[in-house]
Amino acid sequence: MSSISDSPSDTKGTIKVGLGVGLIAGVALFATFLSVDQQLGLPHGLFFKTMDSAFGVEPVLAIFLGICASAIIGVVYNLISENWKTFRIITTPKGILTGAVGGAIVFGLIFVPLHALVFVPAIDANVLSNGSADFTDKEIKSLTSLLINNTHVLWYSAFVHVIFGSIMGLMSGFLLHDRYRNVTRIRSFW
């Protein structure tokens, strides 16, 4: 049990906070995507070109869908945190911890299946096997090297998911602080 006295539920406020923190984390994640080519040692612009080839979605629409998905994840995270006493965000450090756990869950349940079952086979079929005219030889070599060293991508993306889950939890802790001000805490953290 995370608290001795319960605070009143405010679902509409929780949804608003979830939208806000999801958008904040989504924009922060998008800022990381702007430099992902350099961080992974790829030619400039290859990340978004690969998204277009793998999923058939234009980069601007992909950015919009990603930010919408992060807003939905923020709402779900805050609704679960409000309704499950163990994960109720009554302090900012607890928000950071539960956000990191939430980021790891999103990585495991959403990113890994999409990466392994959709993205890698689509890149292999559309780019590497068919020699797409949209990609230069240097870009195809970089993608081949990256897919062979796939663990680097998985570790990097796991790190990014946990970091931005922590940002989402931090922002939730800041915004929900007043709601749980009078809640008696057990060992000051939970």
Residue ranges of predicted features:
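Juxtamembrane/disordered regions of integral membrane proteins
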Residues: 2-190
